[in-house]
């Protein structure tokens, strides 16, 4: 192996390139990997992300839900492996309405998402029940699917910051956010530990 050759050359050290290097070097044992980028890693579009994730996608078809379920599985594996260095959580996505007619739409949307593979629907119409609020941090032992809440007291108890006339909520659960920069640097460090190299430069041609 010389500085001018490599088994694999990856053009770009954004999150996609770094993830590819990680999976080749760490998971597949391909250690002669070079990343080439004229900028610092994770500095072009990778630092513009909202850093949110979700398995909550409409149809037609279940392709996006299936892709995201698999992607979230991989992210959760990395969070466990790293001690959750990139602060992955599962706070969920929350949709709220003051229009009583939309409550039934929330239930229909939740049922459609469940049919696509997003997880089961739980409807909460009374102050009691088994609604499980999301913690501020972490992702373990959290429900998948969605919760539809139509009881005013339950809404006020768990979401006191919402407007007083809120009549229904849809809480999509396998959603949240994490630090994309911390994830990227963790993957890069692990890949480098296995022999991957990062070169500053521009790829101008492929023979």
Regions found by a protein language model. Name each.
Residues 45-51, 160-162:
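Short, flexible, mixed-charge acidic loops at enzyme active sites
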Residues 163, 169-207:
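Helical element adjacent to the flavin cofactor pocket in flavoenzyme catalytic cores
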Residues 51-154, 158:
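Dinucleotide-binding Rossmann-like beta1-alpha1 core, especially the glycine-rich loop
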Residues 25-47:
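Glycine-rich FAD pyrophosphate-binding loop
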Residues 16, 41, 204:
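Conserved Rossmann-like nucleotide-cofactor binding loop
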Residues 2-16, 34:
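Beta1/beta-strand and adjacent pyrophosphate-binding region of the FAD-binding site
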Residues 21, 25-26, 190:
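Gly/Ala-rich phosphate-binding loop of Rossmann-like dinucleotide-binding domains
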């Amino acid at each position: 192996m010389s500085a001018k050759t490599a088994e694999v050359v990856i053009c770009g050290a954004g999150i996609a390139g770094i993830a590819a290097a990680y999976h080749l070097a760490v998971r597949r044992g391909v250690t002669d990997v070079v990343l080439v980028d004229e900028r610092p890693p994770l500095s072009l579009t990778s630092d513009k992300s909202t850093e949110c994730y979700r398995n909550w996608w409409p149809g037609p078809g279940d392709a996006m839900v299936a892709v995201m379920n698999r992607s979230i599985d991989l992210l959760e594996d990395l969070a466990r492996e790293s001690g959750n260095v990139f602060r992955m959580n599962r706070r969920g996505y929350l949709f709220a309405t003051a229009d009583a007619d939309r409550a039934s739409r929330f239930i229909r949307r939740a049922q459609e998402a469940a049919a696509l593979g997003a997880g089961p629907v739980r409807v909460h119409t009374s102050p009691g029940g088994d609604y499980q609020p999301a913690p501020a941090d972490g992702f373990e032992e959290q429900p998948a699917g969605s919760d539809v809440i139509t009881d005013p007291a339950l809404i006020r108890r768990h979401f006191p910051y919402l407007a007083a006339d809120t009549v229904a909520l849809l809480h999509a659960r396998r959603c949240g956010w994490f630090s994309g920069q911390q994830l990227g640097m963790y993957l890069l460090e692990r890949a480098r530990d296995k022999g991957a190299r990062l070169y500053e430069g521009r790829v101008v041609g492929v023979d």
